[in-house]
Structure formats: structure tokens, C-alpha cells
Amino acid sequence: MMLPKEIMMPNDNPYALHRVKVLKVYSLTETEKLFLFRFEDPELAEKWTFKPGQFVQLTIPGVGEVPISICSSPMRKGFFELCIRKAGRVTTVVHRLKPGDTVLVRGPYGNGFPVDEWEGMDLLLIAAGLGTAPLRSVFLYAMDNRWKYGNITFINTARYGKDLLFYKELEAMKDLAEAENVKIIQSVTRDPNWPGLKGRPQQFIVEANTNPKNTAVAICGPPRMYKSVFEALINYGYRPENIFVTLERRMKCGIGKCGHCNVGTSTSWKYICKDGPVFTYFDIVSTPGLLD
């Protein structure tokens, strides 16, 4: 018996697989590509939604599946974008996809950032490396809903200029962004030939146009950067309860069944895929292993 279509929506059935078509593929760096997908079912495309910070499981039949954070704005119906790094068997096959190819997705999964609770606040986004991708979703959503938020600063960093994700896109937005009290800071940490800004993300917090007492902070990057960024934020007066991070680590099934991403102790533990991937500052400091 066929189930009613509304019951088969991916937001309702966490196990449902849905066919999506590759519309465009952009090479961002030597190892990252940006894929634009569209659901083949037009009704599904209209109903499917997500929150910034959520992820999907991308499936290549006969090869495997991989969890990937959505990096587009949920306001752009019918389409979604994934920034995918070639780092293993599945993602190597994904990087061979061309416009017109089809794959399967399930999701979205995870909690996402509490963007509704942030309305009326300034936003400070701090990204490093591949961490730029999920924060791009937050940034584009905030730009699509500009009237809901105060000043915005996006700090985007990488080790080398060639690895700076979405550099051209963000540079092209700078003039318009500044007119809307949006500040974009892009920096590298190791590139001796880089003509632009150089420095680690925490060094640019002081340049943000945000009010520390009324700012929601979203952070994503390699685990080693969090401690220094946390310390800088607290020193500048940002409230710990308004600091959020998203972690893309150890996830496998996406729904908390396999236990692969379970971290912590018998008294304090989390599933990164189900309880996260977005966590508060207090989650981080109270749950051993979240950043290991």
C-alpha cells in the first residue's frame, strides 16, 4: 500500500531516500567542490526545508553514503547546495558527478542553529577551513532576512589563500554588505605570498561591528582553534550562553542509531548527529570528548 505523499516527506520520515539531480558543479579549491542539487519530485522540492546548521546523508548507490552540512540558505526553495571535500572513497566518487547526474539524499538531520532565537541580535560568524561551509548557510539566511538581525560580521579564514572557501563570493558581496552594516573579514594564517589580511580568527574579533552583550556567535573550524577563540570571545565580553559551535565529527548514520558519534562519559554524553551538530559553549565545556 502506498503511503500518502505528505507522510513520505523527508522531514517526517528520517529513513526516506529521495532522488536529487545535480544542476551545477563548481570547483572551489583543489579538494573542495560546490554542488547545486534539485529534488526531482517538484512537490517534494516545494515542501522540503531545513535549518542553517543541519546536514543530509548523501548516498551513492553501490558505493556508500556520507554526512554533509547544507551550505545554502533555506529561503531558496527547491534547491540546496553542498560543499564537499574529496577525502575518502565516497567523496571521491561524488567529485566525479556532472550536471544531469542523480544521487540520493535523506534528511535533513541534526538540530541546526537557533536562528529564530537570534532575531534582534547582532551576529558574529567565525569560520576556518571547511568550517566556512555550514556558516555560509547561516550568513546567506541572515542576508535573506536582513531586517531580523542587527550588525553582522563574518570572519572567514584558512591556512593558505588557495584554500579560502567562497573567497570570491564574499569579496563580491563586500560593498553591498558594508552598506547594510555587514562586515566581511577574510584572512590566511600561513601563506607568505597572500596580499590580503593575515592572522588567526581570534585576532579579528576586536574588529567586529557587533555588540558583545547582544551578539549570537557561531563558530566552525578545526577543533584546535576553539580554545583560543573561546578565550578571546570571553575576554571581549561576549556572553557564553550566546556562543554556539557546529561539529562535523564521527557522524555516520545521521540519526543516533549506530553510536559512532557518541562522545562523553556515563554521566555526560552526546550524539553529535542527533544532539548536535550544533552545540552551546556550555555543552562543549561539560562534555568530555566533544572537541577531541
Curated annotation (Swiss-Prot):
Known SUPFAM superfamilies for this protein?
Ferredoxin reductase-like, C-terminal NADP-linked domain, Riboflavin synthase domain-like
Query: Which biological process terms from the Gene Ontology are attached to this UniProt entry?
Result: pyrimidine nucleotide biosynthetic process
Q: Which Gene3D superfamilies match?
A: Dihydroorotate dehydrogenase, electron transfer subunit, Nucleotide-binding domain of ferredoxin-NADP reductase (FNR) module, Translation factors
Keyword presence, Cell membrane: no
Instruction: Name any cofactors this protein relies on.
Output: FAD; [2Fe-2S] cluster
**CDD domains assigned:** sulfite_reductase_like
Q: Which domain of life does the protein's organism represent?
A: Archaea
Which keywords accompany this UniProt record? 2Fe-2S, Cytoplasm, Electron transport, FAD, Flavoprotein, Iron, Iron-sulfur, Metal-binding, Oxidoreductase, Transport
Q: What is its EC number?
A: 1.12.98.4
What are the binding positions for [2Fe-2S] cluster in this chain? C253, C258, C261, C273
* Note describing how the cofactor binds: Binds 1 FAD per subunit. Binds 1 [2Fe-2S] cluster.
Please describe how the activity of this protein depends on temperature: Optimum temperature is 80 degrees Celsius for maximal sulfur reductase activity. Activity increases linearly from above 30 degrees Celsius to reach maximal levels at 80 degrees Celsius and then decreases to 15% of activity at 90 degrees Celsius.
* Role: Part of a bifunctional enzyme complex that functions as an NADPH-dependent hydrogen-evolving hydrogenase with sulfur reducing activity. May play a role in hydrogen cycling during fermentative growth. Activity not exhibited with NAD. The beta and gamma subunits form the sulfur reducing component that catalyzes the cytoplasmic production of hydrogen sulfide in the presence of elemental sulfur. Not active in the presence of sodium sulfate, sodium sulfite, sodium thiosulfate or cysteine.
Q: What protein name does the entry list?
A: Sulfhydrogenase 1 subunit gamma
Native organism taxonomy: Archaea, Methanobacteriati, Methanobacteriota, Thermococci, Thermococcales
